[in-house]
Protein backbone atom coordinates (compact mmCIF):
# COMPACT_ATOMS: atom_id res chain seq x y z
CA UNK A 1 0.00 0.00 0.00
CA UNK A 2 2.89 2.36 -0.59
CA UNK A 3 2.37 5.48 -2.61
CA UNK A 4 4.96 7.11 -4.80
CA UNK A 5 6.41 10.33 -3.44
CA UNK A 6 7.49 13.35 -5.42
CA UNK A 7 11.11 12.20 -5.04
CA UNK A 8 10.14 8.78 -6.42
CA UNK A 9 8.69 10.41 -9.52
CA UNK A 10 11.75 12.60 -9.90
CA UNK A 11 13.88 9.47 -9.77
CA UNK A 12 11.68 7.61 -12.28
CA UNK A 13 11.84 10.51 -14.73
CA UNK A 14 15.62 10.10 -14.92
CA UNK A 15 15.06 6.78 -16.71
CA UNK A 16 13.24 8.41 -19.65
CA UNK A 17 15.27 9.68 -22.57
CA UNK A 18 13.12 11.87 -24.83
CA UNK A 19 14.70 14.23 -27.36
CA UNK A 20 14.40 17.10 -24.86
CA UNK A 21 13.92 16.87 -21.12
CA UNK A 22 13.13 19.79 -18.80
CA UNK A 23 14.88 19.53 -15.45
CA UNK A 24 16.46 22.39 -13.54
CA UNK A 25 17.80 23.12 -17.02
CA UNK A 26 16.93 22.14 -20.58
CA UNK A 27 18.56 18.81 -21.45
CA UNK A 28 18.82 18.10 -25.18
CA UNK A 29 19.69 14.63 -26.43
CA UNK A 30 23.11 14.60 -28.02
CA UNK A 31 24.15 13.44 -31.46
CA UNK A 32 24.67 9.70 -31.48
CA UNK A 33 27.27 9.28 -34.19
CA UNK A 34 29.85 11.98 -33.81
CA UNK A 35 33.60 11.82 -33.48
CA UNK A 36 35.73 13.49 -30.85
CA UNK A 37 36.42 16.51 -33.06
CA UNK A 38 32.66 17.01 -33.58
CA UNK A 39 31.47 16.62 -30.02
CA UNK A 40 31.62 20.33 -29.08
CA UNK A 41 29.62 21.28 -32.15
CA UNK A 42 26.22 20.30 -30.85
CA UNK A 43 26.24 22.32 -27.62
CA UNK A 44 27.67 25.28 -29.55
CA UNK A 45 24.93 24.88 -32.17
CA UNK A 46 22.17 24.98 -29.55
CA UNK A 47 23.86 27.82 -27.64
CA UNK A 48 23.88 29.96 -30.78
CA UNK A 49 20.16 29.44 -31.23
CA UNK A 50 18.82 29.31 -27.69
CA UNK A 51 20.78 32.21 -26.20
CA UNK A 52 19.84 34.80 -28.83
CA UNK A 53 16.23 36.02 -29.01
CA UNK A 54 16.52 37.13 -32.64
CA UNK A 55 17.84 33.70 -33.59
CA UNK A 56 15.04 32.02 -31.67
CA UNK A 57 12.55 34.17 -33.57
CA UNK A 58 14.19 33.22 -36.87
CA UNK A 59 13.96 29.51 -36.06
CA UNK A 60 10.36 29.96 -34.95
CA UNK A 61 9.56 31.57 -38.30
CA UNK A 62 10.99 28.52 -40.06
CA UNK A 63 9.09 25.93 -38.05
CA UNK A 64 5.91 27.73 -36.96
CA UNK A 65 3.81 26.31 -39.79
CA UNK A 66 5.06 22.74 -39.46
CA UNK A 67 2.19 20.44 -38.63
CA UNK A 68 2.33 17.50 -36.27
CA UNK A 69 2.38 15.31 -39.38
CA UNK A 70 5.41 17.23 -40.69
CA UNK A 71 7.28 16.67 -37.44
CA UNK A 72 6.36 12.99 -37.36
CA UNK A 73 7.48 12.65 -40.99
CA UNK A 74 10.91 14.05 -40.07
CA UNK A 75 11.12 11.93 -36.92
CA UNK A 76 10.34 8.81 -38.93
CA UNK A 77 12.33 9.52 -42.11
CA UNK A 78 15.44 11.44 -41.03
CA UNK A 79 17.02 8.35 -39.42
CA UNK A 80 16.54 6.48 -42.70
CA UNK A 81 17.36 9.10 -45.33
CA UNK A 82 19.47 11.50 -43.27
CA UNK A 83 20.15 14.89 -44.78
CA UNK A 84 18.63 13.72 -48.07
CA UNK A 85 15.19 13.45 -46.46
CA UNK A 86 12.75 15.28 -48.75
CA UNK A 87 10.85 17.94 -46.85
CA UNK A 88 8.57 20.74 -47.97
CA UNK A 89 10.16 22.20 -51.13
CA UNK A 90 13.66 20.89 -50.52
CA UNK A 91 15.62 18.49 -48.37
CA UNK A 92 16.52 18.32 -44.72
CA UNK A 93 20.05 19.49 -45.55
CA UNK A 94 18.60 22.83 -46.70
CA UNK A 95 17.06 23.35 -43.28
CA UNK A 96 20.25 22.18 -41.56
CA UNK A 97 22.32 24.73 -43.49
CA UNK A 98 19.87 27.49 -42.63
CA UNK A 99 19.86 26.56 -38.94
CA UNK A 100 23.65 26.45 -38.91
CA UNK A 101 23.83 30.01 -40.26
CA UNK A 102 21.36 31.15 -37.61
CA UNK A 103 23.43 29.48 -34.90
CA UNK A 104 26.62 31.08 -36.22
CA UNK A 105 24.93 34.47 -36.01
CA UNK A 106 23.84 33.79 -32.43
CA UNK A 107 27.35 32.79 -31.40
CA UNK A 108 28.82 35.84 -33.13
CA UNK A 109 26.32 38.06 -31.28
CA UNK A 110 27.15 36.32 -28.00
CA UNK A 111 30.77 37.38 -28.52
CA UNK A 112 32.42 35.00 -26.07
CA UNK A 113 36.03 35.22 -27.24
CA UNK A 114 38.94 33.03 -26.13
CA UNK A 115 42.36 34.39 -25.22
CA UNK A 116 43.40 33.41 -28.73
CA UNK A 117 40.71 35.64 -30.21
CA UNK A 118 38.33 32.88 -31.33
CA UNK A 119 34.63 32.94 -30.60
CA UNK A 120 32.42 29.88 -30.16
CA UNK A 121 31.76 29.59 -33.89
CA UNK A 122 34.99 27.61 -34.12
CA UNK A 123 33.12 24.63 -32.65
CA UNK A 124 30.69 24.66 -35.58
CA UNK A 125 33.44 24.27 -38.18
CA UNK A 126 33.11 20.48 -38.45
CA UNK A 127 29.34 20.73 -38.81
CA UNK A 128 29.87 23.32 -41.53
CA UNK A 129 32.34 21.04 -43.36
CA UNK A 130 29.95 18.09 -43.09
CA UNK A 131 27.09 20.13 -44.55
CA UNK A 132 29.31 21.47 -47.35
CA UNK A 133 30.05 17.84 -48.23
CA UNK A 134 26.39 16.76 -47.82
CA UNK A 135 27.41 14.35 -45.07
CA UNK A 136 26.16 13.67 -41.59
CA UNK A 137 28.45 11.99 -39.05
CA UNK A 138 26.47 8.78 -39.67
CA UNK A 139 27.08 9.08 -43.43
CA UNK A 140 30.81 9.31 -42.77
CA UNK A 141 30.71 6.16 -40.65
CA UNK A 142 28.68 4.30 -43.27
CA UNK A 143 31.19 5.32 -45.96
CA UNK A 144 34.09 4.08 -43.83
CA UNK A 145 32.24 0.82 -43.14
CA UNK A 146 31.61 0.23 -46.85
CA UNK A 147 34.96 1.46 -48.18
CA UNK A 148 37.77 1.56 -45.61
CA UNK A 149 36.80 -1.04 -43.05
CA UNK A 150 35.91 -3.94 -45.33
CA UNK A 151 32.38 -4.00 -43.93
CA UNK A 152 33.66 -4.82 -40.45
CA UNK A 153 31.97 -3.04 -37.57
CA UNK A 154 34.99 -3.55 -35.26
CA UNK A 155 36.75 -0.45 -36.50
CA UNK A 156 33.95 1.83 -35.37
CA UNK A 157 35.02 1.18 -31.79
CA UNK A 158 38.72 1.63 -32.52
CA UNK A 159 38.24 4.97 -34.25
CA UNK A 160 35.45 6.45 -32.16
CA UNK A 161 36.22 5.58 -28.58
CA UNK A 162 36.94 8.57 -26.39
Where are these regions (language model features)?
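C-terminal accessory/tail domains of diverse enzymes
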Residues: 1-162
Amino acid sequence: NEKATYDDWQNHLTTLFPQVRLKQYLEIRSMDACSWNEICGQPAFWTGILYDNDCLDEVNNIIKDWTLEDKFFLYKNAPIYGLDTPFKKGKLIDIARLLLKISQTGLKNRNFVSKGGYDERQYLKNIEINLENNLSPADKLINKYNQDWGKSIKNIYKENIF
